[in-house]
Amino acid sequence: MNFIYKITNDINGKLYIGKTNRSIETRFQEHINFSKRAYKNRPLYDAMNKYGVNHFHIEQIDICETDEEASTKEIYWIAYYD
């Protein structure tokens, strides 16, 4: 099982679309942890450091059976919200 998720910055409304085969809660915690490390020039992590992780929330927007389907749907949702 794969999930497509959306992370929203509640200050400026900017979005990040991603996919995972773990729970979205686990994936969100990974993003938070990565933002605290030396990952530079990554827009999501830069924004989390600038605005604070408490201004971001995650929600599941789709479910996929296969990795291939998840990749296709991730592209679809990125275009949809662009």
Model-derived features: where do they sit?
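Structure-specific nucleic-acid interaction/processing domains
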Residues: M1-D82
